Amino acid sequence: MKPMKNLLLMGLLSALAAGGALAAERSHFTHFITRDGATLKDGDKVFRFAGIHAPELHRIEDDARGPCRADPRGWGQYFKWPTAQEQQNWIQAMVQTGAKAQRVYVLSVQQEFDKACGRETHILAPETADGMPRLNEKAMRVYDNMIAEADKQGLRLILPFIDHWWWWGGREQLAAFYHEKAEDFYRTDSKTFKAYLDVIRQVITRTNTVTGRAYYDEKAIMAWETGNELEDTNADFLHQTAAWIKKWAPHQLVVDGTYKKINSFALTDPNVDIVSNHYYTNADNNHPGQVTQDLRAVGGQKVYLVGEFGLLPADQLNAIMQSIVHSEVNGAQAAGGLIWGFRGHRHDGGFYWHKESTGHYSYHLPGFAKEGEANQEQAVVDLVRTAAAQMAGQQTMAPLPKPDAPLLRETTSPFAINWMGAAVGRSYDVERAASPTGPWTVVGRDISDGVNEWNPETMVLFRDDYRQLQLGHTYYYRVTAKNESGRSAPSNVISVQHSEENQPPVVTLEPALTTTQDQGVELTASWQDDGLPSREVKVGWQHAGDGQVHFCHADRAQTRAWFTAPGTYALTFTADDGLLKSSKTVTVTVGEATGKAPADFCRYHGEVYGVAEGRLTVMKSDKDALTVGEDGFLGPFANEGDKVSWQVQAPWSGQFLLNVTFNGKWGGKQNSFVVNGGAPQTVAFPQTDEQGQQLRIPVTLKAGSNQIDFGRFAGDWGYMFIKSIEVVAE
């Protein structure tokens, strides 16, 4: 198609799609990003970038809710759409910390477990058997706003279409619409490939409901990527896909979204502008030398991009990032690099988060030295900001701008005050007043919202002091954000009437227990409190007797006690919230010893049981059979029913810890223990090196002999290796 006719067609499609919408607003960008040989250009200026990869600007995996049990994959999560304020905040955080471009994750594809998990997706099944997939309008309006915010704030976007994997639904789920297989996605005569091309057409020709522009006219869209980690990309697949994208989006760039290699056929394809690679340890390419190796393979024929790398210590990430910044082969350099991965502020306070199988957490901007210390968060954020500055010709990163005002959320309680943090705020001060205009008193200083594993069901950013408030009075609150560059203007003001009167803790305790002198007794109390005047509740056990009762831990709700003589004992448990307290008493009847008493009623270290002491149950399989390796680890528990069983001893009935020596060398996984034929106790194991590590699992055992099974039970996943177990009590 000739260029002029093509442009006329684009204009006609745009007008038809707008359907009477308001005229398109003017873009905040002057130019589309273009390619000049192996270099990206913004007008006549070289365009390079570094950042932290933000996969979820358009769809959020809400890890705080945990896995969806209705999804048999085990790790299936809950997802939701971000709010417009969240998208604005996240993009602002990136831009204000130096980002110029960002790659997001793919368009999600409907799959069979979505309904049970309440998940919505971007791509819906066709309405007829041989029809084309449909775009979910609700999802695409969120996508519209992401693009509009990126344009408004000056962030270029790389947008991949379909995933090789099934995390969000990918090629396998697309193929399932047509009763084809995942590999048919790469076969250009398949129904799946035809559907893939139609999804591309629908997306690129969509009119943005926020800007009024067709997607192919959005300057914020730097490039379309064929997909995420499409490692089986072949020449025909790429040739047809890239040409199809260029047909509909002639002003935007095309990325070959392959993985682990540079495709030689991509280098000669006239419609491919950028070749990309992802660096990860499991791909054996997560090192600085990969940059030069790939640049040599590209040979200056295309732009080269490191679309993802990460899950390494900060010093190793910095070595790779500095290689991206400085490596040069015959004048060609990498256009950019993105470290995996970012999560942003929640609408109602705190941050979203994600934990990888390696134990690494997502990074929060602008970085939190204390809260993110174990994750080396501040070091990672700083190395990325430094790289972005170097790519812009500067030696050091610019200071952060002063933060904008946070957004204080309405509440009905002065003990549950939350706000959406400022994009680059590091800490916050909370002020209270008796009137909406002040005078204001600071009641909370240097509060951080950068805590990892934030749970909105159980956590709040600020609780006022109960002792300073009067019941029935109305109080007013506002918040200011701070960072090293200054303080924000105050937030909006909210009013709260204090109507919560402190109540004493409610204690639950069995009224009577029976034991013998040689066994001792396990004491288990529970309590509930209203969280007033604070969430701190002191607990303790007492016996007003003659010293014949001994507690292992008198300051814990669950502990053990033993007795120097038979008799009847009244043991009292108390929960004290600081103003009010409650107590309950259990009567323990202690008979004479029926066996030998243990030397220590509180501590126990049993035998270490290796896999040689266990009994194996091996399921028949053509591959990955359960076996003991030369390193002494048993694995990989690849088939449901694979298990190892031990007979272990316990000195008394009650709670113990199981020291498990395991190896998670191939990534995180989920396996289960079964004690004495009970229900499987599921355990999430992190990734380790080949030496393995220990994990402590709480178990309930009976006095004497117990059977402990470990294996792959229903719902378990991943390859696992185990070496030994040991029963302990401390």
Where are the model-predicted features located?
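Active-site mouth of glycoside hydrolases
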Residues: 26-274, 278-286, 297-302, 313, ...
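Extracytoplasmic
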Residues: 35-37, 57, 516-521, 533-537, ...
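Substrate-binding cleft of secreted/luminal carbohydrate-active enzymes
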Residues: 305-391
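Pro/Thr/Ser/Gly-rich low-complexity, intrinsically disordered linker/stalk tracts
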Residues: 390-424, 471, 489-501
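Extracellular acidic, Ser/Thr/Pro-rich low-complexity tracts
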Residues: 421-426, 483, 526-532, 545, ...
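Recognizes extended acidic, P/S/T-rich segments that occur
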Residues: 429-470
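Beta-strand-rich modules
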Residues: 469-485
